[in-house]
Amino acid sequence: MEGKLLIIGAGIEQIYAYQTAKKMGFSVVGTDANPNAPALIYSDEKLIASTRDPQATIEAVKSLKDYKSIKGVITLANDVPYTVAYVAEALGLPSISLQTAALSSDKLKMKNRFKDSDVNTPVFTEAKTYQDLQKFIQQWGYPAVAKPTDGRGSRGVVFIDENSDLEWVFSYCLSHSCSNKIIIEKF
């Protein structure tokens, strides 16, 4: 392969992607907000931009003289499909749509789309306050699950039963959300 591959994010989970891209013959451009992110040592070029800021990322990319030689944009083990789609679209590269990326990275938007499309999904609501969480539990009972709308994996996800401290649940989930939004759903 020839050309450049842009990898959004450079955490430890992404080292394999950087190494594999290099083995495939790509020149790797890595981006991360942290200039000391572990995977950046495997990149040929480093750009400092938050993985969650699509505009800052594309501005950093376009600062490269030969940014048009980028052949693809990927991420691995990083919940930033919107940034990947945004950058790919700006560079005229194939990718999922911005709408699909937005739906896949925001659990509340995804659940609302499921509901609007008559896809069977558990009862859910956005909890903007601790009182919203209390109200949901009063209405729907236990068990339930609380999670950040924008988290990945199981970060910030809490199973709620009658022994749970709801104030702690709310603050814990919120602390794992970049958007400061959480969702509660019946389990």
Outline where the language-model segments fall.
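Fold-independent oxyanion-binding glycine-rich loops
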Residues: 10-11, 31-34, 148-149, 162, ...
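CheY-like receiver
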Residues: 60-64, 135-136, 169-172
